[in-house]
């Protein structure tokens, strides 16, 4: 799943380059082991980064619920990471 969003104040934390801010594109991809990975990039850029906390276990609601929680965290900002508790 992919969405284009504006990172909230304080941006989002990536493993590779630290905090990124502004307009970003994020994508969540499920894995066979019941986890999902989250990658993020500046919208229109070529480089993708790993959102800190990824991969993470999928919640009972599956990928759509996981993706929505991540979108909400990114929109909230504050050096957002993949939320620890997804239920």
Name each model feature, range by range:
Residues 28, 36, 40, 67-74:
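Amphipathic alpha-helical interface segments used for dimerization/assembly
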Residues 1-27:
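Negatively charged, low-complexity tracts enriched in Asp/Glu with abundant Ser/Thr
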Residues 47-49, 55-87:
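Mixed-charge, Lys/Arg-enriched low-complexity segments
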Residues 32-49:
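A short, structured beta-strand/loop element
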Residues 5-9, 19, 44-47, 51, ...:
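Generic alpha-helix detector with strongest preference for long hydrophobic helices that associate
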